Amino acid sequence: MRLRRNYKGASQLNHQAKLFRSIKTIVDFDDVMVHQAKDYFHDYVKKGIILTLDFEAYKWQTTNEYANISFLFNINRFQYKRVYEPLFGIEYETFVDYLKSFIVLSMDQHVLISLQSFLRDIKRLVKETKQNILEDVYNIKITSPTLCIDFFSSLPCYETLIMNQFLEQLDNLITIQYELKPRQQRQLAQFQSYFAFNDILKDYWEQQLPDEERLFYYPLYLWWQITAVVPLRPREFLLTQRDCLFEKNDKYYLTLRRNNLKGKEKGVSHKIAEDYYLTTYEIPEKLALTIQHYLDLTKGLASTKLDTLFVTETHYKRWERRTGINNRFLTYTNLNTILKYFFNEVVSERYGYQVYYLNPPNRLKDNEINFIHIGDTRHIAMINLIAEGSSPVTAMLLAGHDNVTTSSHYFSNLSQFIECRSYQVYRKLTSSQTTYEISKTQRKYTIGKAYV
């Protein structure tokens, strides 16, 4: 399979990506976005897809020509004001407008049934959250955590610690749902996507890129290089300290923060010094130089309040915005935004791939790829560890699990991973134009805890 760059964009996808780009290129919901959504709403009315004439209506009727699908916006007002309004800082009526806007602006990417299920997820989340939003989310039936993440991460609310932990809990649900499905849950198509994403990112990174563009995508590149090898949780990666790299005896070492909390309680974090410990890993020189290059490029920029590896100025500069006064660290929301931009601007437009965000096929064609989620690399790293010969106990320790049984869920798809990798090696042997690889694990690492 030839790895193709299409810098003019993929014409066959342009009509599909129009609305999706519009929702992504606006960092947060605002009045302009709602107005745009209302324009699209009326366009869908003219096309006969939305049968309700009024955007403000309590209930929308839509049709896909096979069946009528209704959207009932009866969000529990009392529960929203009690739990979610203090968290989001968004009034009830405005929240409903944002929810309607998100659905309209997502209609070119998702079928109506999927969006109806998403709306029901939001209603269940609001209605069934009792006391602790971070714990309750695990007990609430969520069918479309991916869409929930996209929606909540677009809300113009202050990025509190609880908000980011809430998004991570939803990300965890994606992995949990994979494990609850039959054994074929991660089919070859998903592993094909990992290999294809690796190829695209590698090829893109080797291009001559403007510093501003490279800096915007730098966190994504290091996320893939590090967390696809070391099974980190997203927040562990994002809280990597600025002074994380050192050299000793001609070898390079990277210090990472690991969560000291276990099970469902891991989402309840109050003080980094108490909830995280430092662990050091030996890393290849190439990765060390890549991290050092980022440190050099951002040397003169304002550090975050938590003095993390990643600064935020280069992120918000993309939209000509200044970093807020509460510049704690580059958040899960920020990284998720970068990932979505990469899939839209690079994977789809530059390389001409068709991206499946939901309901992917069992096997992909050469120009197709599934969307990858932030939490996926933890799964990849666990499989990679076992595939490279590490013991289940080692995988358990590196993942921060209490027992091997928990870890085994992550590498239960090893056979499919090996099958896919064998398939890609075969493709490599039969065509020298493309190589597939997932970075090999480093054999040397330190498990010892050094509390911060």
State the predicted function of each range:
Residues 1-185, 225:
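Charge-rich, intrinsically disordered N-terminal extensions
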Residues 177-226, 230-452:
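Extended accessory and catalytic-adjacent subdomains in large enzymes
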